């Protein structure tokens, strides 16, 4: 707002110069014709009565020149005196922005589907190069504040690109799956509640570094206490990483295609029985020994050899710990999920696709797979953007990650760095929190960096005092005038009023707490905050494809304009049930010699049995 005020003041000073020039010309005329104060006053009165009676005289240039020199000098001295003063902003310049004006600056005028819905009246265009803001959004709202209803669902129904949803309980999958398919988005489901869908992390390993990352994620995301690192724990962790990395590298380079999965890794771990007699060899020792004879510099051999430097007792403890931490891989249903893959992660960057990752909201047993999925998703998309010349480092389809339960699920180790560089690849993240304490406890040193890397913040309400304080400070302080009054009583009573300038939070923590449940706060980097209504889900034209449109629950449907469902359209009864096995078309494209006719026939029979 400051540049606009300065521009207005400049025009005001320029406008004031015109009457001064008129007065100077009038005084020049009067002083030539009149002598004495009375005559001067009479001439000035006559001039005021007839302003157009000015005449050019010999003194006029002198008077005009004096004004043109002295006036700018006087203005300069005045402004110099006022340089360190900001009238009305002495204690803060925070103020509320206008939602509709903000929307005009940031909405997508050409294509309203290519927008992020922040509130009822505020949109943010997906074209980040136009408005110079990244598309990362922090959403803060307590339980029941409407994070899903007022933010996730409206933005998913935009169907503007590719999406990854972390979906506790599967609510989003059921609500949005059919609508997204209706709008041309290919939907894939990986369900860790009912164990449906297929995701094989080994399928995305292309380099030794990828294998090391997977081993690291398996070790640190399955620990009972991930924060307990350093000292003796650090030695055990690094040894476990080397052990798992050696197995994964062997699977990657030496196993047939149909055995390249984590189930094979678990089978290999169970074969590693360490004897206290250093001369006894287990089956893995023999396997890696044969590989070493064939290729002494094989990456799997190098990792296994480094791991075997420990004592027999140490190695045995590491293996027992690995089996304990990875016990979930011994579940038959889970093992079947990770045997094959149908996620096709890189395709999110080149065509409209949506992946729904369903997780239980009361059990974190399989959360380590979400972390691996996040890690590989970023890795695959970054590599696709950087290694495809025609993309010029930017994916052709925008990929958006709706990271619900952000504080309760492990994220990639270098997530802070990923968030900072994702924008240039046309990737954005929606970080969804219940309160600010969650991200503080998870990222003790980096939580401010994460929020700082998100140019938009939406606050939906809640009941956490630390969040109230944070939002209040984020809104800033405004300058207000206060009135003081003193009254003296008695026979000579008197009263006096005094005014002074002081500072006040735009919203105090208590006012943030008492904010209406229908309201939300929207903050975009470099803009004044906006207080607006939460988005009315029933205003979205694609709602007609969802069960929410027909649901009697909720109050907003009473105020919505009815939209008839399209002729012949029926809602899938259970979208998650459509999650099948690996695509036969994909298998047919593979040219690896391990894909035999028998295997292909077996896969075909398997798929037909699911229909």
Regions found by a protein language model. Name each.
Residues 25, 133-427, 442, 452, ...:
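P-loop NTPase motor domains
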Residues 95-104, 113-114, 119-129, 149-150, ...:
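A broad, low-specificity signal for short, low-complexity segments enriched in glycine/proline
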Residues 179-182, 204-205, 445-449, 473-478, ...:
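Short secondary-structure boundary/capping segments
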Residues 505, 544-547:
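Extended alpha-helical interface modules used as scaffolds for assembling large macromolecular complexes
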Residues 419-521:
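Conserved ATP-driven motor cores of ASCE-family P-loop NTPases powering translocation/secretion/packaging/pilus
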Residues 92-94, 119, 131, 135-136, ...:
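General secondary-structure edge motif
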Residues 359, 363, 405, 433, ...:
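Short loop or secondary-structure boundary microenvironments that flank
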Residues 1-145, 149-152, 477, 488-489:
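Basic- and hydrophobic-enriched, low-structure N-terminal and domain-boundary segments
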């Amino acid at each position: 707002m400051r540049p606009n005020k300065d521009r207005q003041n400049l025009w005001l000073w320029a406008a004031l110069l015109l009457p001064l020039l008129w007065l100077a010309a009038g005084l020049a005329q009067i002083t030539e014709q009149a002598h004495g104060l009375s005559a001067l006053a009479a001439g000035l009165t006559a001039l005021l009565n007839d302003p157009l009676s000015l005449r050019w005289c010999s003194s006029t240039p002198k008077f005009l020149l004096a004004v043109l020199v002295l006036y700018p000098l006087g203005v300069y001295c005045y402004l110099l005196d006022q340089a360190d003063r900001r009238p009305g902003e002495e204690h803060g310049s925070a103020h509320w922005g206008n939602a509709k004006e903000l929307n005009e600056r940031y909405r997508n005028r050409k294509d309203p589907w290519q927008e992020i819905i922040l509130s009822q009246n505020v949109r943010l265009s997906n074209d980040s190069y136009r408005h110079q803001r990244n598309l990362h959004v922090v959403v803060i709202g307590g339980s029941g504040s409407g994070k899903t209803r007022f933010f996730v669902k409206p933005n998913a129904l935009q169907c503007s690109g590719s999406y990854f949803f972390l979906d506790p309980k599967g609510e989003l999958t059921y609500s949005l799956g059919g609508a997204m398919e209706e709008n041309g988005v290919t939907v894939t489901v990986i369900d860790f509640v009912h164990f449906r869908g297929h995701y094989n992390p080994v399928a995305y390993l292309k380099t030794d570094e990828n294998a090391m990352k997977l081993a690291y994620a398996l070790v640190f995301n399955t620990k009972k206490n991930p924060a307990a690192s350093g000292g003796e724990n650090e030695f055990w962790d690094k040894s476990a990483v080397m052990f798992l990395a050696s197995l994964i590298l062997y699977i990657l380079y030496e196993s047939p295609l149909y055995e390249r999965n984590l189930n094979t890794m678990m089978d290999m771990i169970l074969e590693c029985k360490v004897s206290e007699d250093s001369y006894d060899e287990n089956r893995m020792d023999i396997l890696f020994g044969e590989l070493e004879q064939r290729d002494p510099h094989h990456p799997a051999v190098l990792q296994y050899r480094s791991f075997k430097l420990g004592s027999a007792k140490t190695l045995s403890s590491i293996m027992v710990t690995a089996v304990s931490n990875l016990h979930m891989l011994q579940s038959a249903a889970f093992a079947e999920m990770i045997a094959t893959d149908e996620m096709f992660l890189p395709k999110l960057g080149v065509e409209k696709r949506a992946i729904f990752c369903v997780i239980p909201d009361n059990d974190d047993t399989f959360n380590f797979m979400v972390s691996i999925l996040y890690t590989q998703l970023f890795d695959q998309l970054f590599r696709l953007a950087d290694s495809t010349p025609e993309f010029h480092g930017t994916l052709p389809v925008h990929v958006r990650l709706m990271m619900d339960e952000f504080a309760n699920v492990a994220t990639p180790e270098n997530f802070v760095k990923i968030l900072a560089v994702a924008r240039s690849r046309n990737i954005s993240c929606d970080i969804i929190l219940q309160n600010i304490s969650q991200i503080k406890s998870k990222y003790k040193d980096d939580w401010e960096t994460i929020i700082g890397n998100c140019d938009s913040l939406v606050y939906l309400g809640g009941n956490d005092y630390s969040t109230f304080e944070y939002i209040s400070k984020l809104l800033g302080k405004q300058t207000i005038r206060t009135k003081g009054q003193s009254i003296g009583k008695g026979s000579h009573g008197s009263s006096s009023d005094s005014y002074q300038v002081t500072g006040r939070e735009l919203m105090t923590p208590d006012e943030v707490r008492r904010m209406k449940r229908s309201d939300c706060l929207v903050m975009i980097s470099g803009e004044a905050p906006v207080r607006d209504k939460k988005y009315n889900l029933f205003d979205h034209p694609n709602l007609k494809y969802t069960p929410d449109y027909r649901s009697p629950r909720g109050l907003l449907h009473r105020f919505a304009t009815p939209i008839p469902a399209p002729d012949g359209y029926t809602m899938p009864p259970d979208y998650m049930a459509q999650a099948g096995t690996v695509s036969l078309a994909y298998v047919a494209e593979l040219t690896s010699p391990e894909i035999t006719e028998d295997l292909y026939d077996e896969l075909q029979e398997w798929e037909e049995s699911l229909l």
